[in-house]
Amino acid sequence: MKKTFITALACILVAGCGSKSTVDPSLWAPAPIPIQTPWAEEVSPANAHPEYPRPQMVREKWASLNGLWNYAVTAVDAEKPAAWDGQILVPFCIESSLSGVGRRVSAEEALWYHTTFKVPSSWRKQRVMLNFDAVDWAAEVYVNDQLVGHHTGGYTAFSFDVTPYLKKRGDQKLELRVVDGTNNGEQPCGKQVTNPNGIWYTPVTGIWQSVWIEPVRSAAVTSYLAVPDVDASSVDVTVFADGAAEGDEVEIWLREGGVGYNPEKPEGAATVAFAAVAPGKPVRLTVAEPKLWSPESPFLYELEIRLKQGKKVVDEVRGYTALRKSSEVVDSEGHKRMGLNNEPYFQYGPLDQGWWPDGLYTAPTDEALKFDLVKTKEFGYNMIRKHIKIEPARWYYWCDVLGIVVWQDMPSIGGTHGGRWEMWKWASPEDDRELTETAKGTYYKEWGEIIAQLRNEPCIVAWVPFNEAWSQFNTEKAVEFTRSCDPTRLINSASGGNSFPVGDIFDSHNYPNPAMKFTSEGLQIDVLGEYGGIGWPVEGHLWQTDKNWGYIEYKSGEDVLKQYTVYAGQLKDIIAQGVSAAVYTQTTDVEGEVNGLMTYDRKIVKMDVERLRAVNQDVIASMKK
């Protein structure tokens, strides 16, 4: 009998247990911090992010390596340590409370990790892939004292085939050496700085997303690309495979259930399209009665992919896709608008930085990760600008499932935040920064990898190569590069940065009130990429006792809501003049910033939710189509 997807997921979660060597959980406790989220108390070495980490490409068999590892901090040029400093809870970065360590690592130091794991006997005669979902920043990976490979970049997943390095049986030794320059001017790091203050936050070093292993045969699917074409009611799918031979074939099913793809209730999914094609060859799957994805109706189609050699299935993965189009459209009054599925669609949502008091870059649990998104929907928004950070795959999965459109920023290169910045005029080439050749190369490498990793996510509707003028260089070339990586989404060349007539979107920032002091005058889609920042430091829920700030500050939720409502009225005025989207700062307080819709610990929502929702829905409805 064919397994339903929910049954397969249950098997996957069971299979993910038990391969990590056992440790004494009494050796771990969270490092002290001023505040923590409600989910921090649920975290333990036995349950550190146990959920399947890659919902876009699910295999039945896998094993999590999250849990307690040994760690040591040495001089950057030191050999592997002879003894370990203590234990660290993976996947939480060493600076975080939930790591159990809570210490900084400088650019003159190296962070070493050590653990052991067992390969299940049922995986014999298969290759074993070792997967790191994110390590900040430069990593060297060793298995059984042999160098397996290197990786640089703090935001993308990487994998190694470790089969040649494994012993035939028993414990396998895994070690990792990490060096992180943070804001040294050579690498993307977003809001991380070595000296946190104001809008700059605690640095993140080392492993900060899940580590896991999975078995694959000599021929296996490595990735796929699913490109929706709403106008043709179809999805173009290309499946890539490693080790495939001439004559091998991939079979692709596109399925829908009664309410679309839902891993909680996948029973009854019906095939709406099928194709068989050689690996690496694109094929079009046409849907007779298409259902489009939107925040109001986030309909997802299930993808099932099988790699076959003759009649034998050698690999099978499952994922999902959606029929969704992001484009420029013109409304009835001649204004260029952001379009969703060929209709003008006002996009309104918070600036979301994705920081946590207890995990820093890493949410304490998957439920916590989902919580911010559920609240965003409850508040009446339909969009999030993901601000100079890349999230774990499950964050985008929840946006896809819940129905939230996302603008995805590229994390800025640290140490490059000064220089010329004149937002309210057209810029010239001399306004672009001069970065080192190393920094430029790193930017293009990491941005290209980020886009490739996230291209299949229906929720993402716009790429943002630069924020303000931070590390903004050769804007025209950066936009061309972004377009070459993905021609199907809108490009916001520099949100609130130096403006060039390239890309699709002209983006201005104004604090605290919503205003457009300069527009593209019809050349591009005009949006307000940041405004607001209404602050309220809620006693008992603060990261620090002083030096907290917002762009303006109040002492009660009622006062915050009154000011927010005033700004909403002003926002409607500029929407009528052609503004097509707006981003409010911000989802939560972050460290010393107290301008969140919620406190940093997520325990207090600062405004009455029903009234906030009504205001936001009124703003969205005000744009004429």
What kind of feature is each model-predicted range?
Residues 224-226, 304-376, 617-618, 622-623:
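N-terminal carbohydrate-binding accessory modules
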Residues 29-31, 196-205, 210, 218-225, ...:
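Low-complexity, Pro/Ser/Thr- and charge-rich linker/hinge segments at domain boundaries
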Residues 15-16:
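C-terminal motif of bacterial Sec signal peptides marking the signal peptidase cleavage site
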Residues 215-245, 332-337, 619-625:
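Surface beta-strand/loop "capping" patches
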